[in-house]
């Protein structure tokens, strides 16, 4: 058993007790820094990362670690299958550093609409139901696709079953999502989801 410490965007530290073997899903794992925190606390981690440059490092980092399963896929709330993943506009400078900014949201203000790769997307609610194991923590940092995803997790009933859900929202970089993000915040509050934190990072 270990303690996982996550810093929230108000600089407070949230401590989560992780029992050995409990499951965590890391959506938007990038090169695995948060994945590593969960794994070090004793969790089994399922890490999703669609960006090929970040995934190469992620996979190499955990290739001999049986507690971490890495998938070169993104997660969505609807329309699974192939989608365009747009690269950060500064991707040409450093493909790893700027891999954190890649997004399936074409209107994100720091992506290059002409530079993208086709990536496989899975519907997370369906994945979790088929996985059929208790999930202790769900971390979501998927550059704008979190609105669609989280609404589907709530619609499907999956969100009620996960004790800790941490989400980074991106309405500052995607102004078109401001109303949807506000609606999501209101829904989380009005429907009494105390397990969903929309202020992570």
Where are these regions (language model features)?
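Phosphate/nucleotide-binding beta-alpha loop and adjacent structural elements of enzyme active sites
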Residues: 1-201
